[in-house]
Amino acid sequence: MTVFNKFARSFKSHWLLYLCVIVFGITNLVASSGAHMVQRLLFFVLTILVVKRISSLPLRLLVAAPFVLLTAADMSISLYSWCTFGTTFNDGFAISVLQSDPDEVVKMLGMYIPYLCAFAFLSLLFLAVIIKYDVSLPTKKVTGILLLIVISGSLFSACQFAYKDAKNKKAFSPYILASRFATYTPFFNLNYFALAAKEHQRLLSIANTVPYFQLSVRDTGIDTYVLIVGESVRVDNMSLYGYTRSTTPQVEAQRKQIKLFNQAISGAPYTALSVPLSLTADSVLSHDIHNYPDNIINMANQAGFQTFWLSSQSAFRQNGTAVTSIAMRAMETVYVRGFDELLLPHLSQALQQKTQQKKLIVLHLNGSHEPACSAYPQSSAVFQPQDDQDACYDNSIHYTDSLLGQVFELLKDRRASVMYFADHGLERDPKKKNVYFHGGREASQQAYHVPMFIWYSPVLGDGVDRTTENDIFSTAYNNYLINAWMGVTKPEQPQTLEEVIAHYKGDSRVVDANHDVFDYVMLRKEFTEDKQGNPTPEGQG
């Protein structure tokens, strides 16, 4: 019998097993990292062969279930990341997943339906292969020994890697060992969750660090500073910036009181990195979470301000996340469950507190976070139909604008100022099931271009700068901007708003979801353009 005939007979008898191997291999090569592909494929095949030779069906299913579910979940995550963002899954995405609260996950389930279906299909496919006891396959002894050799070799390589890392960093990390070992298994993406867990532990270790600053405190004539951080806001959908629908009438009515930034850009296309970049001394080029304690809250506290953090982004996992490591330093923190307007009573209470101290009040909004149709009460919808994604997104912008109008009303008779900016923008592709989505690898300018302005109460008169800024200004330098706005600076920093803007304007470096640094100016303007700025066939029409 020829080799071909033997293979043909084997394929006919075990075609489902061959199909599993092909699906696993192609999915991992296309949508995941190709690193250690041979070991991962051997691990996958040998595990299936070992399990198929377990004679007891209950025991076979008991052993198979965790392997099947983890492998299917890993592949589904890879497919989601690749199809949605055009990049492989990474530790940045893993951090975002771990920081998502249950309410947010439930709201976004509709966006994940195709990948939940993929998970179900892959799970059933792998179970269909494993469920049948097959004596024609190599014995458990042979496949078991081979599997142990693969596992032992992988563990040895992982230990070598962890040892070198410990030698360089003078400290051993079990997360590095677990992360490296995962890269040799079918559960490759566990590697990124291990790295995310390591980041979580590092954040816990530094969250209570309060540095001492040499500060220069200058009287700006302002007593109350309200900093509003929006979520997932696109400049292209704001009439303040020329959009055809009237989505920002309240802000536009205050145009004479506003210093507008026409070319503000976020340092990163996702919240877990963009907000710390904006509120701490961290930077695009030298990202290090040890910079996080050097933040606007700690500086305001040391300068004698009364500080508040009011958030409609869930308090789930309050400890050990990048944003909450900053928020927890505020003297008073409030988290609400529901729409952004629920923050207004807490803002009123903060304003009414009698004190001789200046106040810094941070409002962290849910804004236009996906799915936008759930970001506002249906009674607040002004654009129809309400199940249209563009109408939903525009309604979310209008809802935020209404909230801003109410904030202005609360502050108009006070010596107060409001700074508003969004953490990042969003991509838009009308051909996709989910039209609006976060930027991924080499994101377009739309994922970074954000609204930003400073509003000054009429009580402050004409002695403040309300001119429009047309140069690029990255929110990665907003910690310096906010410090100067409050009149609380370090000697080495620019001291005034004008000095900060003059010093940092034009720096257009951004980081994408793959942690690669790009020049914003060189990115394509829209997601539906190719890298040279030409409309793609999918984006035409």
Question: For the regions a protein language model found, what residue spans apply to each?
Answer:
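Active-site-proximal alpha/beta segments of enzymes that process anionic O-linked groups
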Residues: C159-A381, H449, T475, N479-S508, ...
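Transmembrane and membrane-interface helices of multi-pass
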Residues: M1-S179
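Membrane-interface soluble catalytic domains
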Residues: A8-Y18, I54-S56, L127, I131-D134, ...
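Short beta-strand segments
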Residues: W309-S311, L360-G367, D394, S417-A422, ...
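Metal-dependent active-site segment of extracytoplasmic phospho-/sulfohydrolases and closely related
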Residues: V226, Y399-F437, N479-N483
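Active-site rim elements
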Residues: V30-G34, V284-S286, D388-I397, G405-F408, ...
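Active-site-proximal cap/lid insertion segments
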Residues: A315-N319, N366-R415, K432, G440-H449
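Histidine-centered active-site microenvironments of extracellular/periplasmic hydrolases
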Residues: G242-S246, F421-P458
